[in-house]
């Protein structure tokens, strides 16, 4: 059943089968009961029998996609070793529908297979063995959900080994994609990563620009992760611009796509959710892609299926040719090349290679580097663009590209650095990093193919520029091929910077071919670039190339084909080839009037016929030889003239155009390429004429488009183009008038030989360009033309009338010399008469076959006086004019002609009035004969105007003449008067009819006076308003006629139902309703009495007519009629008139000036005498023409030019052209200045500058950070060097065995800025020969002040420690005191004052005996602070310790004081004891001190609350101090109480520590830093002066406790820029689990006092590097070096380095952090250790 009925049958049966299948579940027959099976079986058989032909037809018509593409599915289950529930393909075993797993086979069919389970697991899953091909079941359209509007994308599921030619056919044929001009393949990381905001913006903008300008395809991975997500964001940001323009194709593995089941279906539209499941390993597709190719290899959740398919597809696309179009092959021998009419040779535009491919690398993993190597090794190699700064692989490639040398070599030091970077970036082992490094170096061997884009670099400001530059470098093509590639991309910036460079070699003709391609593809910038680089348009443009440009199908749509069809007056075949002859006819049709195109002139048509005619049978018809000849008798003469035309076909210039920019501009205008037309307007000569011609052509095409019912947008666009060119003409005229008035007037009047021998004024009138005519320059010229050679400015009308009525008064008038009017126009005939005596005859124009003998016989009148050139009197500018010349010039002035004609016309009207008002006699009277002669001579004048008009053909002359409104009315009036005159000469009753016609005819002649009023400045605009209102009233009359007839017909039919057929019915319909409009309502006839007889008052009875049926309706409809007609429509007409008035009023001045030109031209061409005397002027003109014909040969002048123009020599013409070009340059210069000074442009420039400054500031900040990082690296290396030197010194000391007292003669001046962590550790505590060190640890409360303690960069907790040392000090009670040095705020050292200071101020509270004073020592310059710690021999018992001072180890307690004397020997006794007799020292454990009293350091805080545990950190650590091996400090003599040691503070560091307290069982996280780093004996520096007066020291009681943190610039730098140090915890001692009793504490105190040894302060040194308790030190990183330097400079000027700085923190914040921390969360503990 073929045909449409078969289709209906198929569809109908399909619906039935579908219903039955769903109703009875035909697919599940096996699941049905036995009772239902027979019915189902019967239905199935019936459906099968009915559908068998339809199913076969369906299979035959199977879609091409199903036949060409396949999918892959796993058909063998091999469990994975990692997950036994999954197959090696990635799917669950249960998802293998309909398959028998291998394990099941072994379990259920043991007889068939005896393999073990291990054998099955050892079998490797492979795509070729364990997958099966089947036709694809997923293709169609995706509708992405979840956005504001759903995006759509085409998709298809294909096998991973699909042939690339099938995919390309799918994209170009099925998906209707145009072959790309560039393929951008984006590679990068698949994991999500963040780009810098600025880099992301530049990346997205550049990628979109590269794709939009070149018509590129973008290949990505398709999924919404990693770099693909950033590509999608870029497409999303430009969605409004790029919709339908950018083709983004995602090639993704089918197995990793989320929601695969939603995409299954054949040629379907599937909604797709873009929300990804965070628990799933699959990913969703990116919604901003336009197409998806899903590669299927049978796996699920695994990448890699698309790699091979994507690379093969890119390779195949790169082999495709781009931009191939049908171009004729043109030979230089134009007589032999015209073979393109029969066949067309294909000449591809652009390179002879395929589609260029470029790889774009953004971020990425190690596999991306392998992909880059594969691209570089391909044949031909694919250029790669690397986006530096995006991270990982991109940065490594950029680094290798920057520092590698030719051949892939790199410096050894950089090689190690790069290997370390690879290890850290990809978490690789050394071996893996080396392998990847080898791949990287292989890539660097072809580094010329790699382009690195660095944001902000001078070479690559945009990434699109980097992409295209890389393609040019990698293409390895010739210069013409590179230019064609840039032309296809439309990237003139690439061509200018990369192709047109110095030293580039260009083959002959290559640039001309590029010019042709640029013109066809409408690439204005390339045309400009080619012209700048030496392409000669004169040599380039030939007849054949111009014709090819008119026949191109590229570029914007245009109406040229429709115009040619209108001109040819017939349908054209689809493959019709437009010739230049057709173009000439179209131009003449659009320009209208008498315009004559060069393409239709005899010379060009003969040349065209000789070149192309023999190869073209219809050449003669196209040339128009037969059609254009007006008279039959002239054909023989015309053909003879054709043979006489001398054309040298061997001349190479014969095929070129003298003004190529003219021809190209007209081509651009007709092809609707506005930008190209504007460009060609700027080049070449006669710019003003070109602008006016373009204005007229666009306006005419817009009119044609609106007449042909085309889309309104086309007409509006063409009108807009016309206004643009018109504005250019006016602005150029204004510019030239400002520079030189006379040359500007010459521009308006000189003859344009290339534009139908017209003038700019004539072209402006033809284009109806009112603004151009109304310009001051044009009006001044018209005024001079109007006055002729008369010099009159005031009362010109009265003077002219007086001269006409009294001719002797002419001699008193002033006249202008010829030199005063160098720009004055004249007729061609007069010009030739002036040239005859001076030079031999020269044919100025070619002859044309359309010259009419009648025109030659009539000739023309002298439109203007003959101004013969008098060489002898040129120097005398104001010479006297002869009387005869004055009379002649007077009567030939247009103003005189106007008044002469006006006076004659007024006399004619007076005589006409007399004729129609008086009795008409049998024969005409004298007055009547005068009127008849006036009309008759006026008719002859009208015939002369027609015959002497500019068009060549008689029919065209008539058409042009009838376009004038007054000419049409004059013709009607003359014909009507002629009819009346004929009837008047007849007998009665025709004589009366003639008289009536006279009476009617005079109405028009009165109206004709309005044309005369038009010359007046005030009356002229009103005349035009009347004309406009008349047109509006015509539309109103049509509407009024509808209303009037509706009422009139109804009224007439109701009131007069029994009328007979008559013409009176028409009159009766309109008569009364029409007069009702003006207020005559005929009240007596509205409701006349009718019906019964009426009795008057006098008793008489009046018989009334019977009432008409329905007569009562007439008043009702009359009321409605009057309401609509009198009120609504009349007021509507008034409103329309009002609108017209204001519309015309706004342009009335321009309209009047435009009409003034027409009036001036009319009287300029008229003879001197008015009708009826004009007959004498006609006779004179005939006589002159006959005489001229005798003196000239017939062939000398083929065309008669009757226009008024300025004829100038070639030198003057060149001068005018130069002046015009200067004006154009000045015009564009001023235009650019105005544009640059406009507010919008200034705002834009300012915005760009601010953005650039912002980018520069960002770059400066980045460089500053880079410099800081470099300085930090230098600091670290210097610290390491110092550490190395220290260790070397220690080693040398051990080797030489020198004593420290002899070797350490110089005090160390180590700066606190040392960044070596190990060195700082060694400088972290006191060290004495037999001394003890005590460290107090303080936990850092995060809620405390952040500016005091440095922030550790690690996640480890932090801890402070303070160093203590003990000296053998005895008071009166024999108590040994422990001296403590601790930190207040930032390393300020404070203790109580000495006892001497207490004595000086008795009112002050008591202070501890031990003092710590800080004094500057000018004799020993140091960048740090010298700290003097004093220990007094005596301690008065009457001085009680302060509550707010620190008592270490409970020294202030009575129990401790009582125990101390009995256990501790005195100082002198101790000194006399032998070492063996001294009390043994032991370490004090934590348990021994838990019961000691701990007091606050700060007066701002009271004692700790009882509920708060005093130890919130680790217990104080114990470190054994051994003899330092460093020789940097002096070894002191045994302990002397009279001398105080000097302590120097340096820096601190962190060390991580975690521990548990046995006392509390609470884990405490701590971090440690140390503060005291140096201590020397004061005997080296005159100790007596150092401790002269304790009260004068800053630490005295009489002084305020000073905070030295503000005067320590190095410490401030460390606090303001936190350092990051880390240490490992030291080994802790064993802690007791239970708290000790008070008795045990008392015993411990007693034991402690007995075991306190007198230390000998030798030096403050570091822990030895070999000590087991030394924490491991990591490198410290400083964040600000400049701030440290600045602070050093600021503090260098302070006289007292210990005074508080103004910039320090306010005192209101309280005491130091150390005090407050200890008061809240810390306590002291001490340890004792004796150095062996």
UniProtKB/Swiss-Prot annotation:
Keyword Transmembrane helix belongs to the record: yes
Key words, A-Z: Calmodulin-binding, Cell membrane, Ion channel, Ion transport, Membrane, Receptor, Transmembrane, Transmembrane helix, Transport
Catalytic activity field: Ca(2+)(in) = Ca(2+)(out); Mn(2+)(in) = Mn(2+)(out); Zn(2+)(in) = Zn(2+)(out); Mg(2+)(in) = Mg(2+)(out)
Biased amino acid composition, Basic and acidic residues: 831-847
A molecular function (GO) term: calmodulin binding
Region (Disordered): 829-851, 1610-1732
Annotated Polar residues bias: 1635-1653, 1690-1701
Cytoplasmic side: 1-894, 949-964, 1014-1028, 1138-1732
Chain positions covered by the region annotation Calmodulin-binding: 192-215, 300-323, 601-624, 793-816
TM segment ranges: 895-918, 926-948, 965-985, 990-1013, 1029-1056, 1112-1137
Topology class, membrane: Multi-pass membrane protein
Major location category of this protein: membrane
Region (Required for the inhibitory action of G-beta/gamma-subunits of heterotrimeric G-proteins), start-end ranges: 617-625
Subunit annotation: Homotetramer. Interacts with TRPM1; the interaction results in the formation of a heteromultimeric cation channel complex that are functionally different from the homomeric channels.
Function: Constitutively active, non-selective divalent cation-conducting channel that is permeable to Ca(2+), Mn(2+), and Mg(2+), with a high permeability for Ca(2+). However, can be enhanced by increasing temperature and by ligands, including the endogenous neurosteroid pregnenolone sulfate and sphingosine-1 and suppressed by intracellular Mg(2+). Implicated in a variety of cellular processes, including insulin/peptide secretion, vascular constriction and dilation, noxious heat sensing, inflammatory and spontaneous pain sensitivity.
Protein name, per record: Transient receptor potential cation channel subfamily M member 3
Lineage of the organism: Eukaryota, Metazoa, Chordata, Craniata, Vertebrata
């Amino acid at each position: 059943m073929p045909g449409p009925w078969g289709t209906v049958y198929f569809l109908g049966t399909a619906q039935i089968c579908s219903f039955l299948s769903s109703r009875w579940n035909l697919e599940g027959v096996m699941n049905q009961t036995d009772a239902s099976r027979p019915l189902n079986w019967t239905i199935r058989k019936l459906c099968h029998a009915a559908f068998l032909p339809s199913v076969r037809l369906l299979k035959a018509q199977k879609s091409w996609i199903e036949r060409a593409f396949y999918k892959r599915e796993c058909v063998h289950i091999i469990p994975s070793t990692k997950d036994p529930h999954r197959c090696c393909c990635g799917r669950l075993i249960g998802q293998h529908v309909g398959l028998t797993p291998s394990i099941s086979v072994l379990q259920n069919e043991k007889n068939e297979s005896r393999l073990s389970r291990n054998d099955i697991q050892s079998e490797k899953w492979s795509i070729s063995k364990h997958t099966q091909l089947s036709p694809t079941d997923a293709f169609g359209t995706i509708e992405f959900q979840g956005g504001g509007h759903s995006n759509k994308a085409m998709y298809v599921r294909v096998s991973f080994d699909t042939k690339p030619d099938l995919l390309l056919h799918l994209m170009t044929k099925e998906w209707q994609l145009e072959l790309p001009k560039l393929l951008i393949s984006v590679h990068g990381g698949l994991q999500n990563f963040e780009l810098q905001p600025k880099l992301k913006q530049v990346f997205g903008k550049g990628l979109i620009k590269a794709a939009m300008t070149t018509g590129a395809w973008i290949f990505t991975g398709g999924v919404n992760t990693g770099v693909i997500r950033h590509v999608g964001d870029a497409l999303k940001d430009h969605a409004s611009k790029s919709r339908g323009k950018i083709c983004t194709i995602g090639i993704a593995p089918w197995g990793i796509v989320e929601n695969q089941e939603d995409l299954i279906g054949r040629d379907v539209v599937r909604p797709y959710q873009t929300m990804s499941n965070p628990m799933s390993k699959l990913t969703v597709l990116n919604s901003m892609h336009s197409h998806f190719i899903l590669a299927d290899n049978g796996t699920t959740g695994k990448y890699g299926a698309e790699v091979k398919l994507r690379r093969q597809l890119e390779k195949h696309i790169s082999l495709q040719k781009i931009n191939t179009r049908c171009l004729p092959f043109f030979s230089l021998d134009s007589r032999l090349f015209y073979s393109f009419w029969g066949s067309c040779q294909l000449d591809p535009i652009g390179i002879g290679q395929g589609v260029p491919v470029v790889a774009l690398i953004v971020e990425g993993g190690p596999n991306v580097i392998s992909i880059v190597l594969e691209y570089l090794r391909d044949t031909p190699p694919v250029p790669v663009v690397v986006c530096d700064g995006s991270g990982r692989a991109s940065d490594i490639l950029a680094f290798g590209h920057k520092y590698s040398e030719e051949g892939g070599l790199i410096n050894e030091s950089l090689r190690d650095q790069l290997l370390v970077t690879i290890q850290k970036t990809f978490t690789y082992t050394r071996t893996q990093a080396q392998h990847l490094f080898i791949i990287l170096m292989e890539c660097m061997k072809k580094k010329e193919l790699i382009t690195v884009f660095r944001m902000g670099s001078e070479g690559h400001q945009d990434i699109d520029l980097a992409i295209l530059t890389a393609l040019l470098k990698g293409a390895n093509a010739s210069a013409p091929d590179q230019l064609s590639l840039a032309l296809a991309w439309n990237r003139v910036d690439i061509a200018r910077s990369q192709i047109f460079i110095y030293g580039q070699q260009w083959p002959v003709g290559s640039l001309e071919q590029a010019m042709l391609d640029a013109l066809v593809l409408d690439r204005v910038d390339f045309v400009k670039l080619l012209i700048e680089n030496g392409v000669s348009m004169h040599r380039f443009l030939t007849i054949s190339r111009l014709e090819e440009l008119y026949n191109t199908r590229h570029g914007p749509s245009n109406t040229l084909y429709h115009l040619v069809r209108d001109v040819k007056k017939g349908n054209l075949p689809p493959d019709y080839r437009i010739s230049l002859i057709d173009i000439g006819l179209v131009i003449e049709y659009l320009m209208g009037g008498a315009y004559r195109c060069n393409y239709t002139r005899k010379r060009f048509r003969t040349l065209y016929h000789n070149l192309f005619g023999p190869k073209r049978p219809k050449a003669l018809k196209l040339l128009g030889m037969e059609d254009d000849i007006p008279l039959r008798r002239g054909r023989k003469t015309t053909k003879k003239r054709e043979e006489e035309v001398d054309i040298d076909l061997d001349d190479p210039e014969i095929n070129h155009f003298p003004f190529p920019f003219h021809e190209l501009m007209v081509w651009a205008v007709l092809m609707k390429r506005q930008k190209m037309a504007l460009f060609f307007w700027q080049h070449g000569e006669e710019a003003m004429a070109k602008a006016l011609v373009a204005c007229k052509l666009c306006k005419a095409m817009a009119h044609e488009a609106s007449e042909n019912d085309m889309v309104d947008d086309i007409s509006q666009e063409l009108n807009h183009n016309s206004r643009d060119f018109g504005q250019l003409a006016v602005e150029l005229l204004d510019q030239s008038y400002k520079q030189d008035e006379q040359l500007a007037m010459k521009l308006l009047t000189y003859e344009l030989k290339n534009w139908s021998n017209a003038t700019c004024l004539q072209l402006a009138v033809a284009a109806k360009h009112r603004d151009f005519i109304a310009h001051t320059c044009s009006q001044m010229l018209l005024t001079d033309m109007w006055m002729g050679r008369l010099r009159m400015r005031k009362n010109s009308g009265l003077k002219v009338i007086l001269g006409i009525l009294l001719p002797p008064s002419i001699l008193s008038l002033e006249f202008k010399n010829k030199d005063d009017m160098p720009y004055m126009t004249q007729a061609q005939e007069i010009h030739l008469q002036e040239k005859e005596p001076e030079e031999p005859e020269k044919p100025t124009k070619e002859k044309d076959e359309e010259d009419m003998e009648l025109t030659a016989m009539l000739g023309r009148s002298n439109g203007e006086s003959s101004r013969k050139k008098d060489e002898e009197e040129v120097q005398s500018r104001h010479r006297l004019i002869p009387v005869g010349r004055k009379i002649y010039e007077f009567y030939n002035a247009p103003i005189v002609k106007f008044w002469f004609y006006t006076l004659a016309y007024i006399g004619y009207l007076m005589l006409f009035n007399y004729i129609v008002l008086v009795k008409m006699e049998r024969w005409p009277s004298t007055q009547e004969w005068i009127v008849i002669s006036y009309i008759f001579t006026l008719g002859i004048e009208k015939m002369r105007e027609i015959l002497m008009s500019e068009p060549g053909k008689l029919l065209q002359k008539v058409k042009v003449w009838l376009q004038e409104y007054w000419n049409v009315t004059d013709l009607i009036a003359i014909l009507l008067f002629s009819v009346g005159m004929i009837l008047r000469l007849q007998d009665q009753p025709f004589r009366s009819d003639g008289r009536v016609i006279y009476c009617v005819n005079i109405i028009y002649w009165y109206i004709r006076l309005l044309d005369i009023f038009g010359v007046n400045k005030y009356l002229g605009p009103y005349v035009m308003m009347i004309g406009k209102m008349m047109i509006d009233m015509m539309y109103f009359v049509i509407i009024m006629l509808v209303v009037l007839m509706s009422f009139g017909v109804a009224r007439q039919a109701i009131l007069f139902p029994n009328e007979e057929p008559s013409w009176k019915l028409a009159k009766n319909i309109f008569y009364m309703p029409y007069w009702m409009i003006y207020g005559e309502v005929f009240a007596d006839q509205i409701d006349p009495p009718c019906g019964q007889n009426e009795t008057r008052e006098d008793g008489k009875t009046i018989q009334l007519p019977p009432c008409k049926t329905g007569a009562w309706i007439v008043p009702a409809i009359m009321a409605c009629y009057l309401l609509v007609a009198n009120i609504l429509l009349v007021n509507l007409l008034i409103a329309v008139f009002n609108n017209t008035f204001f519309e015309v009023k706004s342009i009335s001045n321009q309209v009047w000036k435009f009409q003034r030109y027409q009036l001036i031209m009319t009287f300029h061409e008229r003879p001197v005498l008015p009708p009826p005397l004009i007959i004498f002027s006609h006779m004179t003109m005939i006589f002159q023409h006959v005489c001229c014909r005798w003196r000239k040969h017939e062939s000398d002048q083929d065309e008669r030019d009757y226009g008024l123009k300025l004829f100038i020599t070639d030198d003057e013409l060149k001068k005018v052209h130069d002046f015009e070009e200067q004006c154009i340059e000045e015009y564009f210069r001023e235009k650019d200045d105005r544009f640059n000074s406009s507010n919008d442009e200034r705002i834009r420039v300012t915005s760009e500058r601010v953005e650039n400054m912002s980018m520069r500031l960002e770059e400066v900040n980045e460089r500053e950070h880079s410099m800081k990082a470099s300085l930090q690296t230098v600091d670290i290396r210097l610290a390491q060097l110092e550490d190395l030197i220290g260790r070397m010194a220690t080693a040398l000391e051990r080797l030489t065995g020198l004593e420290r007292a002899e070797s350490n003669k110089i005090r160390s001046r180590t700066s606190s800025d040392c960044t070596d962590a190990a060195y700082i550790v060694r400088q972290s505590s006191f060290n004495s020969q037999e001394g003890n060190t005590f460290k107090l640890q303080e936990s850092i409360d995060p809620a405390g002040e952040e500016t005091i303690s440095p922030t550790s960069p690690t996640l480890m907790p932090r801890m402070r420690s303070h160093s203590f040392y003990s000296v053998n000090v005895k008071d009166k009670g024999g108590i040994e005191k422990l001296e403590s040095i601790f930190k207040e705020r930032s390393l300020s050292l404070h203790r109580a004052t000495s006892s001497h200071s207490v004595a000086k101020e008795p009112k002050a509270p008591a202070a501890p005996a031990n003092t710590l004073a800080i004094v500057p020592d000018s004799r020993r310059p140091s960048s740090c602070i010298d700290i003097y710690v004093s220990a007094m021999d005596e301690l008065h018992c009457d001085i009680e310790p302060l509550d707010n001072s620190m008592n270490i180890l409970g020294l202030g307690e009575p129990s401790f004081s009582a125990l101390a004397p009995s256990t501790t020997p005195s100082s002198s006794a101790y000194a006399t004891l032998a070492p063996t007799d001294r009390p043994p020292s032991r370490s004090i454990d934590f348990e021994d001190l838990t019961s000691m009293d701990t007091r606050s350091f700060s007066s701002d805080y009271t004692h700790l609350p009882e509920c708060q545990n005093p130890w919130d950190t680790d217990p104080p650590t114990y470190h054994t101090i051994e003899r330092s091996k460093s020789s940097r400090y002096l070894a002191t003599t045994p302990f002397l109480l009279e001398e105080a040691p000097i302590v120097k503070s340096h820096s601190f560091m962190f060390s991580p520590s975690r521990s548990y307290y046995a006392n509390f069982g609470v884990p405490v996280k701590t971090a440690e830093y140390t503060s005291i780093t140096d201590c020397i004996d004061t005997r080296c520096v005159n100790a007596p002066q150092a401790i002269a007066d304790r009260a004068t020291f800053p630490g005295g009681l009489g002084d305020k406790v000073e905070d030295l943190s503000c005067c320590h610039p190095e410490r401030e730098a460390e606090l303001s820029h936190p350092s990051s140090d880390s240490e490992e915890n030291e080994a802790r001692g064993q802690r007791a689990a239970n708290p000790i009793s008070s008795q045990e504490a008392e015993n411990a105190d007693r034991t402690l006092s007995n075991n306190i040894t007198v230390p000998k302060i030798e030096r403050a040194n570091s822990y030895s590097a070999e000590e087991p308790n030394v924490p491991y030190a990591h490198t410290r990183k400083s964040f600000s070096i400049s701030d440290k330097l600045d602070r050093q400079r600021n503090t260098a000027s302070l006289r007292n380095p210990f005074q508080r700085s103004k910039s320090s923190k306010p005192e209101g914040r309280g005491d130091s952090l150390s005090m407050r921390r200890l008061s809240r969360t810390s306590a002291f503990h001490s340890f004792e250790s004796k150095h062996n």
